[in-house]
């Protein structure tokens, strides 16, 4: 972004005839087209990719499992980011102005925080689910049931929505920073200034679950490695049917854990720059240039578009489900009971 200044061609007001209007930074037509394509592609992928995930899991009975219900709910959170957050943030970033009103700015910010925290909660519960599944695959079905999954999903939605609504609709997030907030929030702007206390709470809310997930997945892969060695050592011996079944179940759960582990890592990488930037701004006087802030935001937003790509890369059943949905076979009465899995696990 060192060439950022070369992209700027003019400076004018967002609302030329209104006092207190924000300054609009205009980019060259070519740059604007490129930015709209890049951001628009992310929004479209987040909407339609996650919509495919939700339809796949909810329609095909073979995919009705506690883990997949969590994945579908996670896809719903990412879908809502693509619908309610990314399109409006795209216009704000490219036009450097907010044209949707002050009330919608608050709603947009609230949705941004709520749905992103909802994703984090879902991933944390998925990590716990995978830990139980890999460490004790035969007992797992009795521990992590559909009702338990439903409780996890409810918590993953209710707490973030309550937290986000309470913080942004009461105005407590900028206590002590009212002058700075008034200066930044000119007419045509939608910049949320958060004080140190709330930034610290936000960062702890990100780093603590992240640390828990790292520990869980670290243990998962240690257990998976031990299981793989055990299977390898007993491979030449005659296995009983129960031992063979346990090996197949363990192999399947390890594969699922690997895929969902990639999803967790992608989330961490996407959100880490934004979390660090928030800390720097809160404790060093909001020194981050606007374009750095926008890059951090869009790295985080793009995470909502990544998960469907990860599923398509690692899950053959998801690729098959997409084919069935796109070709219209999903409209057949028998499609819900279709076999999406290969014979070999």
From Swiss-Prot:
Family that this chain belongs to: Belongs to the G-protein coupled receptor 1 family.
Function: Olfactory receptor specific for trace amines, such as beta-phenylethylamine (beta-PEA). Trace amine compounds are enriched in animal body fluids and act on trace amine-associated receptors (TAARs) to elicit both intraspecific and interspecific innate behaviors. Beta-PEA-binding causes a conformation change that triggers signaling via G(s)-class of G alpha proteins (GNAL or GNAS).
Signal peptide start-end: none
Cellular compartments per GO CC: plasma membrane
Keywords attached to this entry: Cell membrane, Disulfide bond, G-protein coupled receptor, Glycoprotein, Membrane, Receptor, Transducer, Transmembrane, Transmembrane helix
Topology of this chain in the membrane: Multi-pass membrane protein
Name of protein: Trace amine-associated receptor 6
The keyword DNA repair is assigned to this record: no
Gene: TAAR6
